[in-house]
Design a protein with these regions (language model features):
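Bacterial Sec-dependent N-terminal signal peptides
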Residues: 1-19
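Ligand-binding face of N-terminal immunoglobulin V-set domains in extracellular IgSF glycoproteins
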Residues: 20, 24-118
Length: 118
């Protein structure tokens, strides 16, 4: 019995909940099944949000919200060879998950940084 109680007290310390992060820009309304689906990931360089940098990991995942199963994974691609966008002051990456055509609720997960989209 003591072992079971110890496990339940230890479990919250072992789990690492993912942080919902606003660096992922996705269509909040959704995508039609055969549409091009691209998320934009931003890394602020200048401006009000510059103190909140973010560089995505080498591989991002698209996960189904209901059971958190990975349905697609791929590498983010640097926008404009990694240049900073003059108007926004951000560097950006594109994450194309257009091959996913099954309607459902999904989120983008960055396992290297333990962050996810809304």
């Amino acid at each position: 019995m003591k072992g079971i109680l110890f496990f339940f007290f230890l479990l919250p310390l072992l789990s690492h909940p993912q942080t919902i992060d606003n660096h992922f820009k996705i269509d909040q309304i959704g995508y039609r099944p055969n549409d091009k689906k691209i998320a934009v990931i931003s890394d602020p360089q200048t401006g009000y949000n510059a103190p909140d940098p973010y560089t995505p990991g080498a591989t991002l995942e698209l996960r189904r919200e209901s059971d958190h199963v990975v349905v697609f994974s791929g590498a983010p691609v640097a926008w404009n060879s990694g240049a900073t966008h003059a108007q926004s002051g951000d560097k950006a990456w594109w994450f194309d998950f257009s091959t996913v055509t099954t309607p459902d609720d999904y989120y983008i997960n960055d396992p290297a940084n333990n962050k996810r989209s809304y």
